[in-house]
């Protein structure tokens, strides 16, 4: 049985008597602390497995496409292979087969901490294996070693106008980091395509290492009068270094950041940012260009700005209704929002049909660390009322809260009130998932993405409809 097969079986067995054995098997799948060495062992096995699968089932149909799907943003079309995570409508996201609660239980934590380290999740996403503390420690130190920014990127960030949106700065700086691309250099020198993944791995590791420095510099320049981000401490984990560079020293905020960066990392391959990185990467654009393109998608109001919209709506609600709000007044406000043609931000999801587990774990964090915060109480009250109102309205396929309904409130509580910046945090996190997949896309030799497009007249002719 392959290591990746073990990771797929483990979650189904965690509740059984064999749970301990499976967890031990997954944890001990590889003793090496060097991620590239582990990958070098996994890649040929996965290549062989997929080759055999395609030989046997390559011509097998996996579904039908309707006209509504074509006009509806390709919702429900099974058209991508994405290995690192799968989104179940009822269970929510699973990272390499593991649910968020399982990741919280199994992934290594910082000394004295309770939330999983994002390094551990990245190892899991790349390998399918639950890492050891030693493997996570190696990754923390490796990213610290690779974190320094080239001088031209620092100069660029320092000279951006203050009215340029943080996401525009983030994307531009990532594009400029392409000067450091090992993959672009190797490709120009004619490297064998069997080795593409090795250089994509190096670029991805470098980029993930540098993103907190880029993000922190943007934050300091815009909101802290350009003060220094300080130096990376190789003895600290990735999230701890990030919060230090941002200027936040509260241990609970660092714990929140570990949780935030873990749960926002990946959400299967069809969302805008993940699909964009896959699409651009399929042209053999290097990871810097691919990820920068993904961030331009994440900056869109329909993708990464939702948590900001939640806070704007909550603030307006507080301003209109005052402090303590009765359930009846809350219901009336929600109905007024809906009747005006607007939606309740933070509720509903394109795929999910239950409460987003990413919302649930943030709610649990808030119940433990800030149960009396007025804004959290408001969010908790909405959780009790909004789903019933949406069900009563009868339009929503999913009346339950998603991840965005909670994250902004937590950040505000610890003093990060700059809402325009929140999507940058989302972007730092999303790198873990899409870059883990990008490495595998090159390792598995995925081709240039080129779906067939059709005109409306062509579709009408295809289904036998009259044009006009």
UniProtKB/Swiss-Prot annotation:
It catalyses: oxaloacetate + acetyl-CoA + H2O = citrate + CoA + H(+). Oxaloacetate binds at residues 358, 430, 450. The active site is at 303, 349, 404. Pathway: Carbohydrate metabolism; tricarboxylic acid cycle; isocitrate from oxaloacetate: step 1/2. Residues 1-30 form a transit peptide. One of its GO terms (biological process) is citrate metabolic process. The keyword Mitochondrion applies. InterPro entries: Citrate_synth-like_lrg_a-sub, Citrate_synth-like_sm_a-sub, Citrate_synthase, Citrate_synthase_AS, Citrate_synthase_euk, Citrate_synthase_sf. Keywords: Mitochondrion, Transferase, Transit peptide, Tricarboxylic acid cycle. Citrate synthase is found in nearly all cells capable of oxidative metabolism. Key enzyme of the Krebs tricarboxylic acid cycle which catalyzes the synthesis of citrate from acetyl coenzyme A and oxaloacetate. Homodimer. PANTHER family: CITRATE SYNTHASE, CITRATE SYNTHASE, MITOCHONDRIAL. This is Citrate synthase, mitochondrial.
